[in-house]
Regions:
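Catalytic Walker B motif of ABC-type/P-loop ATPase nucleotide-binding domains
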Residues: 162-166, 171, 407, 480-485
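Conserved beta-strand
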Residues: 5-8, 17-27, 58, 341-347, ...
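Pre-Walker A (P-loop) beta-loop-beta motif of ABC nucleotide-binding domains
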Residues: 22-33, 188, 359-370, 402
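ABC-family P-loop ATPase nucleotide-binding domains
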Residues: 75-140, 409-470, 474-479
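ABC ATPase nucleotide-binding domain signature region
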Residues: 31, 44-106, 365-368, 373-374, ...
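H-loop (His-switch) and adjacent beta-strand-loop-beta switch element
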Residues: 202-218, 522-537
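GG-anchored amphipathic helix commonly corresponding to the ABC/SMC/Rad50 NBD signature/C-loop
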Residues: 144-163, 462-482
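Coupling and communication elements adjacent to P-loop NTPase active sites across diverse families
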Residues: 1-11, 90-143, 147, 227-350
Length: 539
């Protein structure tokens, strides 16, 4: 079944236009990704297609309603699992019939779906949710469990059109791989909003939502990335040509002004020598001034137009090269032992051991480590053990003296009650001058009009850039960089920025992430798998 969206316009309640008159057609069986920077309207557009949000203008055409897996679940917290899956009516009808209520309305509601309860429980079981009841409130579930509840609904409802909004955000590695297998093998029409580049490479087309319009690219993410790099290279050439033209026009304008000044001075002297009547001389001067004024106006208009074109081109081609972690090298020599763990395990009070078997490992300076495992398997607990925030229940853990910086998925070092400039100043331990702070903010794509913006209103990508800008301002070169799911709330461009910055870092890295693409690009050396309590090496 196909999806046709025609002339869709959405305007925020504050009358700000998000997008106007956009079109998208997805053919039967086509698997398409919808990508774009944070704030471009991807999730809003998906909600309009799903019918959970009303557009101001436009038309959506599809033969059967799509099944929608949302990104955020707050609106479902007061519902049961059955209600969130929209099967509560059938379950109530089935229960009423089995208890002797043979009314026609119950049979119509059930629609011969006599196995609805068994099918639903089997679908939940397939996603590892056998411990969850259909009558259980959604608010009692974790983010990963809520996602898997909605993913189980695909098997229950068997839709011909499927809409997924950031489906891997809360999933661990095993659940992601299950979703990847489904996407690869399914034959339904699919539209996915995601920053998971492994998932995006499984799709056949990329639809980019940018500046209020959708551009369709044939091929998966890697092909799309190549196309975008070519477009940006071409845009860079045009930008440089425009800059060159603007310099030429400014030079010409200066030369014209200088010639005019010289001509006027020479003309006055000659008129005095030749005895030209004052009235005639005034007329000649007036004509010359009109001509010069017109020429000046032409040059000024041209310069203004070129300057506006350059401003638009620069905004569509941000300077990502300026965002680098210019930390000095860590003071530790490569290969120094930072942490030695021997047969460690952890547990709270009367609870048993967290891991099935104790763990032993050794972290040396310059290495890049990944901690992986299922949700709830103790990855963050292990981080706290390594950094000395928690003691092990058993075994020994020896830590050398080293400095570390912790970056979580919320970028919590950025305080929501500060403005962008206040946040930067809070890390100004080197006593930079005001203009130096603002120069660094500009380097990290925070221009003048963002300095008074509340940090609470920043997107995930903006918080990431500001967090790393603050680290640059403080120049606290860490011996160990700890990254806890750093890509979870970022758009693709922001992920590529943080990848570039972390790759350039020359110290030790300890990473928790389920993003296989990100892990591969960082060049991980060692892996600790917490769910099995064992150490693996060589990714």
């Amino acid at each position: 079944m196909s999806i046709v969206a025609q002339k869709i316009t959405y305007i925020h309640p504050d009358n700000q236009v998000l997008f106007k008159g956009i079109d998208l057609t997805i053919n039967k069986g086509q698997k398409v990704a919808l990508v774009g920077n944070n704030g471009s309207g991807k999730s809003t557009f998906l909600r309009i297609l799903a019918g959970t949000l009303q557009a101001q203008e436009g038309e959506i055409i599809y033969p059967t309603p799509p099944y929608y897996v949302p990104q955020h679940f707050g609106q479902y917290d007061n519902l049961t699992v059955a209600q969130a899956l929209r099967i509560d009516g059938k379950l109530e009808a089935l229960r009423a019939i089995t208890e002797g209520d043979a009314s026609l309305s119950n049979f119509n509601t059930l629609a011969d779906d006599w196995t609805i309860e068994e099918r639903s429980l089997a679908a939940l079981h397939a996603w590892g949710l056998e411990h969850i009841l259909l009558s259980q409130p959604m608010r009692t579930l974790s983010g990963g469990e809520k996602t898997k509840v909605f993913l189980s609904g695909i098997e229950i409802h068997q839709p011909s059109i499927l809409l997924l909004d950031e489906p891997t955000n809360h999933l661990d590695r095993r659940s992601r791989e299950k979703l990847y297998d489904f996407i690869t093998s399914c034959r339904i029409t699919l539209l996915v909003v995601s920053h998971d580049r492994t998932l995006l490479n499984l799709l056949s087309s990329i639809a980019e939502l940018s500046v209020g319009e959708i551009t369709l690219y044939g091929g998966n993410y890697d092909f799309y990335k190549e196309q975008k790099e070519q477009e940006q290279a071409s845009m860079q050439e045009k930008l440089e040509a425009k800059e060159k033209e603007l310099r030429r026009v400014r030079k010409t304008a200066r030369e014209v002004a200088e010639r005019k000044q010289k001509h006027e001075s020479r003309g006055e002297k000659q008129s005095v020598r030749k005895g030209i009547p004052r009235i005639m001389m005034g007329g000649l001067k007036e004509n010359a001034e009109k001509s010069a004024s017109k020429l000046k106006e032409v040059h000024e208009d041209k310069m203004e137009n070129l300057a506006n074109e350059l401003k638009q081109m620069r905004s569509s081609l941000p300077d990502l090269q300026g965002m680098k972690l210019d930390f000095s090298a860590s003071g530790l020599h490569e290969g120094k032992i930072l942490v030695t763990a021997k047969e460690i395990n952890f547990g709270y009070a009367e609870a048993g051991d967290l891991w099935p078997s104790p763990m032993s490992f050794q972290i040396k300076s310059g290495e890049r480590w990944l901690i992986q495992g299922d949700n709830g398997s103790g990855k963050t607990t292990l981080l706290k053990l390594i950094t000395g925030q928690l003691p092990p229940r058993s075994g020994s853990l020896i830590r050398a003296d080293f400095s570390s910086i912790y970056i979580d998925q919320e970028y919590s070092i950025v305080r929501n009650d500060r403005t962008v400039y206040e946040q930067a100043q809070a890390f100004n331990e080197r006593h930079f001058q005001e203009h130096e702070i603002k120069t660094l903010l500009n380097r990290f794509l925070f221009p003048h009009d963002t300095w008074k913006k509340s940090c609470g209103k920043l997107s995930g990508g903006e918080k990431m850039r500001l967090a790393f800008c603050c680290l640059m301002i403080s120049n606290q070169t860490p011996d160990l960089f700890i990254l806890d799911e750093p890509t979870n709330n970022l758009d693709i461009q922001s992920i590529e920025i943080i990848t570039s910055m972390i790759r350039a870092y020359r110290g030790t890295i300890l990473l928790i992430s389920h993003d296989a693409y990100f892990i591969r690009e960082l060049g991980i050396h060692q892996i600790i798998t917490t769910f099995a309590g064992r150490l693996k090496t060589n990714l």
